[in-house]
Amino acid sequence: MHRSRVMSMDPVLKQKIRRKLIQIAAFGFTNCHAGNFITGKLYNGKFKEFCTPGLNCYSCPAATVSCPIGSLLAVTGKADLKVSFYVWGFLLAIGAVLGRAVCGFLCPFGLIQDLLGAIPVRKFRLPKILTYVKYVVLGVFVVVVPTVLVIATGHAAPLYCKYICPAGMLEGAVPLLLTHEQLRDSAGTLFWVKLGILILVIAGCLFVRRLFCKVLCPLGAIYGLLNKVSLYHLTVDKSKCINCGKCSGCCPMDVDPVKHPRSAECIRCGACKAVCPKGAITIGFGDGKKKAS
């Protein structure tokens, strides 16, 4: 009886439940030490030597593994080429296999944005040109400026983490300040500036679905560049498509999968597949390259 109910479940609801369960599991695996939110301690065990595929602050009290962007900036700032190659290799390998499916299923900050986006207020679409800002952020704050500073001075601060990252504020700085009086007393101008950025991002995510993913995330920029070649991809069978527009209408990233099945913005969430009345959309590791254009 239970199995028959699951099989007959509305495909849109089924997709939402399945995806949310995966997101929650990924969030839980990445943040196993929830008790540290009370004590204010950080986990510093062996698992912190490894990166999570998604964006999750190293300084989050619950974090079990490291943030790939934070790790990349940390080793770049010390000119540690061996470890830097490891982090880049990890990101490129994950991106080549999954592309931005990481953003859709495995990123803790992505889950937070989805929860904010589920609040029933009017949603708006951003001009497409703003989606290119994240590539500027990646180039300037993660790659070019840190590299130039290391070459010139032998050291570089983790610029993106220090000056922009709202995930670091929400998951790391704010919880730590709540549990450490000394940190609260020493909070300066930079803290309040970053708190302002966090508030703007949170408010923006209420009205623009996945705002941070679209505009500011350097990790999404890296995976997005690999979306066109990733093994896990979206395919549209245009012989079945009736151009009803339901797929583009439900996309949280404002992608038209019929026109751009391998868009750098697509997070492979499966919403378009679930809503398609003709089953024209598939997502997986198949040989769908010939069907997708």
Tell me what each language-model feature is:
Residues 1-254, 258, 264-293:
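Non-ligating segments of multi-cofactor redox enzymes
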